[in-house]
C-alpha cells in the first residue's frame, strides 16, 4: 500500500474544486397542523386519530408544502458558511496511508459502509477525517427539505417529498456538497433523533418536530470521535438507523420516521475501551493508525502544522492544486464505478478467505468486493485485479474475526496470510 499512497496524497489522487461546504438545515422547528398548511419552511398536514382499542394516538403525514421565496435565497444559505473554521488540507496529511485510503474508498462508494479508525492518541485521526470535507462531491437535494432528500431516487426521499413527487409536483432542486455531521459524546437522544412536542400534539392537535443529527446526516457522513466511549443507548440508536436506513422517533404513541442513510465514520483509542461487537460489525472497513516513528517525518509533520496554525489561508493555498487534482480523481472514480468489473474467480477466492477465517455473516464478502471495485476505479481501471483485493481485504475483515485472547498476531496479518495461501 505504501507504494500506492506514499507519504503524500499528491502522487495519486486529485479532484474538481468544490470549496463551498454545505450549510446546516434550518434550526427552526417544522410545524404540522391537521388539515391545514402553514409556516415559512416545511409544512405538513397531520391527521391525528385514535387507534382502535387504544387510548394513544398515531400520527400520519397527509400533505406537505414547501414555501421558498427564491432558489437564490436557498443557495445563499448554503454558501453562507464558507470556511468558518479553516480545515487542514487532506493532501497535506503525512503518512497514515491506510486510513486515508479507507476514507477515500468510502467517498467513492458510500455503500461500503463506513470506517472505524483505531489508534494511538495524537496520530491525526480526527484531523484526517475532518480534512475530508474539502474533497466531498456535490449532490442534488430538494430545496428546503431538512432530510437532504434525493429529487429522483425514492429510496432516499423523505415521506413528504415522496408524496409530492407521486402527485406530479415539481420540487425545487439545488446542488450542495455532501454533509459531514459531528456527533458529540455528550449529545442527548433527542438531539440525535429529533424532538417531538407531545403536549401540543395531544392537546392542541399541533405537532412540532425538529429534526436531529441523523436527519442532517442523511445522504452524508456521520462522524463519531471517541466512538468507543459513546453511551450504550446512543449506540443502539446508531445501530438501528445504520441497519434500516430510517430513523423513527416514538414518543407516547406518536411516531414519525425519516430516511437516515449515512456513512458512519468512527475513531477512538483502544486503550480507553473496546467497542461493542454489534457496532463494530456495522463498519465496512477498519483502519489501524500508529505513531510515526521516522524522525524526519515527525519533524515534517510538526513544521507543516506550525505553518498551518500561523497562516491557515496561505497554507491551504499551497496545497490547492493537489486538492483539486484529488477531487477530480475522486469524481472520475465515482462516475466510473458502475463500469468496474470483478471476475467470478476473484469473488470465489474472496469468499474462501472469509469462510476459512470463520467470518460470521456475509458482510465481509460484500464489503471486500465493493472496496476492491472502488480501489480499481480510483486507479482508473475497469477491472479488479488480485493486487486490489490484497490491498483492501485486511481492512475489510480484521474487525470481523473472532477474538482469541491468547493470539498475539494482529488480525490484519492473519487475513493477509490466508489471502496469500488461497491466491497463490
UniProtKB/Swiss-Prot annotation:
Role according to the record: Involved in chlorophyll biosynthesis. Catalyzes the insertion of magnesium ion into protoporphyrin IX to yield Mg-protoporphyrin IX. The magnesium-chelatase is a complex of three subunits, CHLI, CHLD and CHLH. The reaction takes place in two steps, with an ATP-dependent activation followed by an ATP-dependent chelation step. Possesses high affinity for ATP and may play a major role in chlorophyll biosynthesis. Does not bind abscisic acid (ABA), but is a positive regulator of ABA signaling.
Pathway field: Porphyrin-containing compound metabolism; chlorophyll biosynthesis
Gene this protein is translated from: CHLI1
Name this polypeptide is given: Magnesium-chelatase subunit ChlI-1, chloroplastic
Lineage: Eukaryota, Viridiplantae, Streptophyta, Embryophyta, Tracheophyta
Alphabetized UniProt keyword annotations: Acetylation, ATP-binding, Chlorophyll biosynthesis, Chloroplast, Disulfide bond, Ligase, Nucleotide-binding, Phosphoprotein, Photosynthesis, Plastid, Transit peptide
Residue sites binding ATP per the record: 119-126
Family per record: Belongs to the Mg-chelatase subunits D/I family.
Assembly and binders: The magnesium chelatase complex is a heterotrimer consisting of subunits CHLI, CHLD and CHLH. Interacts with CHLH and CHLD.
Amino acid at each position: 500500500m505504501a507504494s500506492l499512497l506514499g507519504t503524500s496524497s499528491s502522487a495519486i489522487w486529485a479532484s474538481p474544486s468544490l470549496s463551498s461546504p454545505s450549510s446546516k438545515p434550518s434550526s427552526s422547528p417544522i410545524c404540522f397542523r391537521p388539515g391545514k398548511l402553514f409556516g415559512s419552511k416545511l409544512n405538513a398536514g397531520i391527521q391525528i386519530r385514535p387507534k382502535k382499542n387504544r387510548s394513544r394516538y398515531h400520527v400520519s403525514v397527509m400533505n406537505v408544502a414547501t414555501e421558498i421565496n427564491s432558489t437564490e435565497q436557498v443557495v445563499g444559505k448554503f454558501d453562507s458558511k464558507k470556511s468558518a473554521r479553516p480545515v487542514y488540507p487532506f493532501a497535506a496529511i503525512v503518512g497514515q496511508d491506510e486510513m486515508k485510503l479507507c476514507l477515500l474508498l468510502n467517498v467513492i462508494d458510500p455503500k461500503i459502509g463506513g470506517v472505524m479508525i483505531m489508534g494511538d492518541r495524537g496520530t491525526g485521526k480526527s484531523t484526517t477525517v475532518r480534512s475530508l470535507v474539502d474533497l466531498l462531491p456535490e449532490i442534488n437535494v430538494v430545496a428546503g427539505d431538512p432530510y437532504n432528500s434525493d429529487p429522483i431516487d425514492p429510496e432516499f426521499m423523505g415521506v413528504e417529498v415522496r408524496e409530492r413527487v407521486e402527485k406530479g409536483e415539481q420540487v425545487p432542486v439545488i446542488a450542495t456538497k455532501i454533509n459531514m455531521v459531528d456527533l458529540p459524546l455528550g449529545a442527548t437522544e433527542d438531539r440525535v433523533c429529533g424532538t417531538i412536542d407531545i403536549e401540543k400534539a395531544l392537546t392542541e392537535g399541533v405537532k412540532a418536530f425538529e429534526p436531529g443529527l441523523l436527519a442532517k446526516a442523511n445522504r452524508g457522513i456521520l462522524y463519531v470521535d471517541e466512538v468507543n466511549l459513546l453511551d450504550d443507548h446512543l449506540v443502539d440508536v446508531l445501530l438501528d438507523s445504520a441497519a434500516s436506513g430510517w430513523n423513527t422517533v416514538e414518543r407516547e404513541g406518536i411516531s414519525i420516521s425519516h430516511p437516515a442513510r449515512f456513512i458512519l465514520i468512527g475513531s477512538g483509542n483502544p486503550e480507553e475501551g473496546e467497542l461493542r461487537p454489534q457496532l463494530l460489525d456495522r463498519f465496512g472497513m477498519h483502519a489501524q493508525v500508529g505513531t510515526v516513528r521516522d524522525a524526519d517525518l515527525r519533524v515534517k509533520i510538526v513544521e507543516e502544522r506550525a505553518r498551518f496554525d500561523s497562516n491557515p489561508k496561505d497554507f491551504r493555498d499551497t496545497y490547492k492544486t493537489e486538492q483539486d487534482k484529488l477531487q477530480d480523481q475522486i469524481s472520475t472514480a465515482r462516475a466510473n464505478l458502475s463500469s468496474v468489473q470483478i471476475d467470478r474467480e476473484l469473488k470465489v477466492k474472496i469468499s474462501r478467505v472469509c469462510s476459512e477465517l470463520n467470518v460470521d455473516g456475509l458482510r465481509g464478502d460484500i464489503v471486500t468486493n465493493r472496496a476492491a471495485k472502488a480501489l480499481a476505479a480510483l486507479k482508473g481501471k475497469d477491472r479488479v485485479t488480485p493486487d486490489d483485493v490484497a490491498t483492501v481485504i485486511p481492512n475489510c475483515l480484521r474487525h470481523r474475526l473472532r477474538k482469541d485472547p491468547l493470539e498475539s498476531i494482529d488480525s490484519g496479518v492473519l487475513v493477509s496470510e490466508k489471502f496469500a495461501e488461497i491466491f497463490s
